[in-house]
């Protein structure tokens, strides 16, 4: 009983306020009180109420709210509600961060994270059960294509729960940038429709100067072997390269190649031989674009790491050997320049296909979607792991629906310009699912498996390890607050259900690929949650942010190839130009690359979310330390990059987005 001071915070996004009245109730351990005053929440404002409550409520557990309307339901985005009790009592925060629609009653639990074991009296048990029951109706598993990991049910944006939709500033920026890209494409098409492309410099007609200094560097130096090799270490797709343990069985040496074999074996013995194998593309059906057959290869590249850190190609094999056929030719740096350049173009095109489908879409976007759906179905908002992970799930469902309806849909961008479009992209995604191993999502294990630990010129490896370690310590700090023993982990039914839902349902039985179906110890929880957060932040950034830099100059990353892979070494400039994308394909690649790869004006850097899901000083101290470590890493990378000829920026915490939001 006594005077209560209530503050209500409304989101700042367009339309976040509401013309509807909002009524509040306070629910304590010993009673409940309806507040006589009502409020009209205004966008970006805090509304304060002071109410005399005659009843004794005891410690506050919930704030309940109901938005009433007469003629029109006007949705309201509520950030949080705080309550200060009589006298000099502590202020208690009730996080919301969601849209309030309709006229039903919404209960907001006090912001302290609680596992089931931390609620021995069961004060929140009914709320947990009812919230998850409602969530499971909203968040249902779907199956975009048979044979793939699962996704959120619903084929259209408006099938998504309102809380998964872009806020207005994000929506406007995304749609305006898309319209701008398509308008520029139309202009370029009209200017080039009657012109013939005869020279590689003709690609300058569609190149957007000034968008990226690194893209201009790529345009000027893309033919160099050093830049070709560098991309496997620090380019848009740094997850293919591995140190060779032996010469690949597919590498068949034709007569007269004994010297090459000896050179490779020497590098192998010295531990400086690396490979990039694109065998996953073998057998994938190539696209047909406007009645014109496109083509795919499945290259193998062998590279040597020099003492100065440069990674240089030694040999390229474009196709796998076939029984009963002569071995495929091996292309060498000493071959005629156009033959060697064309072979490298084939590798870059193959890397483009695997990058966009396997590394980016499957391992970034679709994996993050599994984490989102499982989290919303299995962890109530009061659970500490939910509070920890929810900032890293923002906007993922909408951007993925947009991808499925615009990029990889029937007649989408992939079908229009990609050599894997027209169904090959789905076939490739299915086959790539076999390589979704638990260890490959965890940089300490993945980099060790690929032999990249200690490679000083692999800035991706260095930065990924550092960011992983910082995230791990952050997760460990929160986990240690709520799980004092391993038994507490084993006895948390919501945590176990969440883990099992990801592995068995979302990932379609991934326990045979190392994913856990249960968590038995605190360190296992830390590792698993760190994997989830790193996948949604650092790993996605590492394969997303480089697109504008490395793919703007189309010959460096051709979206399709219009002639078959060469079987001889008599290539000419005419052969190269006839193989690379035509002007429309190249223009569309450039436009989409700009729209998706540009730095986003509406973004939240990793760890910098404004939402406060936790109450209490201890979790806030953990978050503060996390942000300090991120800032220190960002500064270290900045200092290192200042000394580099080609800075590596993609894992700088200040540019890594907090979720898969683009």
Swiss-Prot record:
Localization: Cytoplasm, Cytosol; Cell membrane; Lipid droplet
Tissue: Detected in monocytes and eosinophils (at protein level). Expressed in airway epithelial cells.
Mutagenesis / variant outcome for changing residue 560 to M: Loss of catalytic activity; Loss of arachidonate 15-lipoxygenase activity
Its EC number(s): 1.13.11.31, 1.13.11.33, 1.13.11.-, 1.13.11.12
Example GO molecular function: arachidonate 12(S)-lipoxygenase activity
CDD domains attached to this UniProt entry: PLAT_LOX
InterPro entries, per the entry: LipOase, LipOase_C, LipOase_C_sf, LipOase_CS, LipOase_Fe_BS, LipOase_mml, PLAT/LH2_dom, PLAT/LH2_dom_sf
The PLAT domain, residue ranges: 2-114
Outcome of swapping residue 617 to S: Does not affect arachidonate 15-lipoxygenase activity. Does not affect protein affinity for (9Z,12Z)-octadecadienoate
Keyword Membrane: yes
Superkingdom, taxonomy of origin: Eukaryota
PROSITE patterns: LIPOXYGENASE_1, LIPOXYGENASE_2, LIPOXYGENASE_3, PLAT
Induction: Up-regulated by UV-irradiation.
GO cellular component: cytoplasmic side of plasma membrane; cytosol; lipid droplet; membrane; plasma membrane
Cofactor entry: Fe cation
SMART domains: LH2
Keyword Repeat included in the entry's annotation: no
GO biological process, one term: linoleic acid metabolic process
Topology term for the membrane: Peripheral membrane protein
Comment, domains: The PLAT domain can bind calcium ions; this promotes association with membranes.
PANTHER family per record: LIPOXYGENASE
Family listed: Belongs to the lipoxygenase family.
Assembly and binders: Interacts with PEBP1; in response to IL13/interleukin-13, prevents the interaction of PEBP1 with RAF1 to activate the ERK signaling cascade.
Purpose: Non-heme iron-containing dioxygenase that catalyzes the stereo-specific peroxidation of free and esterified polyunsaturated fatty acids generating a spectrum of bioactive lipid mediators. It inserts peroxyl groups at C12 or C15 of arachidonate ((5Z,8Z,11Z,14Z)-eicosatetraenoate) producing both 12-hydroperoxyeicosatetraenoate/12-HPETE and 15-hydroperoxyeicosatetraenoate/15-HPETE. It may then act on 12-HPETE to produce hepoxilins, which may show pro-inflammatory properties. Can also peroxidize linoleate ((9Z,12Z)-octadecadienoate) to 13-hydroperoxyoctadecadienoate/13-HPODE.
Protein name: Polyunsaturated fatty acid lipoxygenase ALOX15
Gene source species: Homo sapiens (Human)
Lineage: Eukaryota, Metazoa, Chordata, Craniata, Vertebrata
């Amino acid at each position: 009983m006594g005077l209560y001071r209530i503050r209500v915070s409304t989101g700042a996004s367009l339309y976040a306020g509401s013309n509807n009245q909002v009524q509040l109730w306070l629910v304590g351990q010993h009673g409940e009180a309806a507040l006589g005053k009502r409020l009209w929440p205004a966008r970006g404002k805090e509304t304060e109420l002071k109410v005399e409550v005659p009843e004794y409520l005891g410690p506050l557990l919930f704030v309940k709210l109901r938005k009433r309307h007469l003629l029109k339901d006007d949705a309201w985005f509520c950030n949080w509600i705080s309550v200060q009790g009589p006298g000099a009592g502590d202020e208690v925060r009730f996080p919301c961060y969601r849209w309030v629609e309709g006229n039903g009653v919404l209960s907001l639990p006090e912001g302290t994270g609680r596992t089931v074991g931390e609620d021995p009296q069961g004060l929140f048990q009914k709320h947990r059960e009812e919230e998850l029951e409602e969530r499971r109706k909203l968040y249902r598993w779907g199956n975009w294509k048979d044979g793939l990991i699962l996704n959120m049910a619903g084929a259209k944006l408006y099938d998504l729960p309102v809380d998964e939709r872009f806020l207005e500033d994000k929506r406007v920026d995304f749609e305006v940038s898309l319209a701008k890209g398509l308008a520029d494409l139309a202009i370029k098409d009209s200017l080039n429709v009657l012109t013939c492309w005869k020279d590689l410099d003709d690609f300058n007609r569609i190149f957007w100067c000034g968008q990226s200094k690194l893209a201009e560097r790529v345009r000027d130096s893309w033919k160099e072997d050093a830049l070709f090799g560098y991309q496997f270490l620090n380019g848009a797709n740094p997850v293919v390269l591995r140190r060779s343990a032996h010469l690949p069985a597919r590498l068949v040496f034709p007569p007269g190649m004994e010297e090459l074999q000896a050179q490779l074996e020497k590098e192998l013995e010295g531990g400086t031989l690396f490979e990039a194998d694109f065998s996953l593309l073998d057998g994938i059906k190539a696209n047909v674009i406007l009645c014109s057959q496109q083509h795919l290869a499945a290259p193998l590249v062998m590279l040597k790491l020099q003492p100065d850190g440069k990674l240089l190609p030694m040999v390229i094999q474009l196709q796998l050997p076939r029984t009963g056929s002569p071995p495929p030719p091996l292309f060498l740096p000493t071959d005629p320049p156009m033959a060697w350049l064309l072979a490298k173009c084939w590798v870059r095109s193959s890397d483009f296909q695997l990058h966009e489908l396997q590394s980016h879409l499957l391992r970034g976007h679709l994996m993050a979607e599994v984490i989102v759906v499982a989290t919303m179905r299995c962890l109530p908002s009061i659970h500490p792991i939910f509070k920890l992970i929810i900032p890293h799930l923002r906007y993922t469902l909408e951007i993925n629906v947009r991808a499925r309806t615009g990029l990889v849909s029937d007649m989408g961008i992939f079908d229009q310009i990609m050599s894997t479009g027209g169904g090959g992209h789905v076939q490739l995604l299915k086959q790539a699912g076999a390589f979704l191993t638990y260890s490959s999502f965890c940089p300490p294990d993945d980099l060790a498996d690929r032999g990249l630990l200690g490679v000083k010129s692999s800035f991706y490896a260095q930065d990924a390890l550092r960011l992983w370690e910082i995230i791990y310590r952050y997760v460990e700090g929160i986990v240690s607050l709520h799980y004092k023993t391993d038994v507490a982990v084993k006895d948390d039914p919501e945590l176990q259900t969440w883990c099992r839902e990801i592995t068995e349902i979302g990932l379609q039985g991934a326990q045979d690929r190392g994913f856990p179906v249960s968590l038995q110890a605190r360190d296992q929880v830390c590792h698993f949650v760190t994997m989830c957060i790193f996948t949604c932040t650092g790993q996605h950034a590492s394969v997303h942010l480089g697109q504008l830099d490395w793919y703007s100059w189309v010959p460096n990353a051709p979206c399709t190839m219009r002639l078959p892979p060469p079987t001889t070494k008599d290539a000419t400039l005419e052969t190269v130009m006839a193989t690379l994308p035509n002007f429309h394909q190249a223009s569309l690649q450039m436009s989409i690359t700009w729209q998706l790869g540009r730095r986003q004006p509406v973004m939240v850097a990793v760890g910098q979310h404004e939402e406060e899901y936790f109450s209490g000083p201890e979790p806030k101290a953990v978050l503060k330390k996390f942000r300090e470590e991120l800032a220190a890493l960002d500064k270290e990378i900045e200092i290192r990059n200042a000394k580099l000829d080609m800075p590596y920026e993609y894992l700088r915490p200040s540019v890594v987005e907090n979720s898969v939001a683009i």
